[in-house]
């Protein structure tokens, strides 16, 4: 991920398809930076599916991005959670699914939110939506310094490669860098062909992304939930017996 620009403080992670591993890459990158003695925050900006928040058991946590941007939550400190993995690593969950995610990401309040995080942290690592699902990733990227585009071996159809190349060539994303996830290191016959196309494109370009999971409930966080334990499970850091 070699780039020529200055400090790459806000890092957005996206992909072509769901299940490419962008949330896994986001979390591991943030942890690596925290271990390097940098103050880091992970922000779940997939406001439609809230994948990272779901992985952490916080999908219905009202104290998240959507609540803060909408004005329901006034204090930024109320949506910042300590990860429990490292003192340098915080997490901001997505909050409840808003009716207008793209509009929320285009708001002045969102710009102020990101500016505040830039002041507070050395690095802001954003878990965004798949770039070919909805416009949210392109909207968010206007505030990013670096874009990590995750491709998963065996998932991406080769017919999608020209679209990814076009994103790179036309500089749709700031300092776009590619991460190949799940690589076995060897050649694979018929790589991805005939699998990703129907999933990525039929899924895609905004139609229905996250709509089937829309919830406006006032769910209360399970008091038994342990954020640190879930993060360790997700990162594979638990002690083996």
Question: Which residues are covered by each model-predicted region?
Answer:
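P-loop NTP-binding module
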Residues: 1-241
């Amino acid at each position: 991920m070699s780039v020529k620009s200055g400090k790459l403080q806000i890092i957005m992670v996206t992909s072509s398809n769901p299940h490419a591993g962008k949330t896994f890459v986001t979390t591991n990158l943030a942890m690596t930076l925290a271990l390097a003695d940098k103050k880091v925050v992970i922000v779940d900006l997939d406001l439609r599916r809230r994948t990272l928040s779901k992985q952490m058991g916080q999908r219905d946590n009202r104290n998240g991005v959507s609540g803060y941007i909408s004005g329901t939550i006034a204090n930024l400190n109320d949506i910042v959670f300590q990860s429990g993995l490292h003192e340098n690593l915080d997490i901001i969950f997505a909050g409840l699914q808003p009716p207008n995610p793209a509009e929320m990401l285009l708001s002045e309040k969102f710009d102020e939110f990101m500016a505040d995080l830039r002041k507070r942290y050395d690095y802001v690592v954003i878990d965004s939506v798949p770039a070919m699902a909805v416009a949210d990733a392109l909207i968010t990227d206007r505030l990013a310094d670096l874009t990590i585009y995750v491709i998963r071996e065996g998932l991406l159809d080769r017919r999608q490669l020209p679209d990814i190349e076009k994103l790179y060539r036309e500089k749709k994303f700031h300092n776009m860098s590619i991460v190949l996830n799940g690589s076995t290191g060897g050649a694979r016959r018929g790589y991805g062909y005939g699998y990703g196309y129907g999933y990525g494109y039929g899924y895609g370009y905004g139609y229905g992304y996250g709509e089937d999971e829309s919830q406006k409930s006032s769910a209360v966080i399970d008091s038994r939930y342990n954020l640190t334990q879930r993060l360790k499970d997700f990162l594979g850091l638990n002690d083996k017996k």
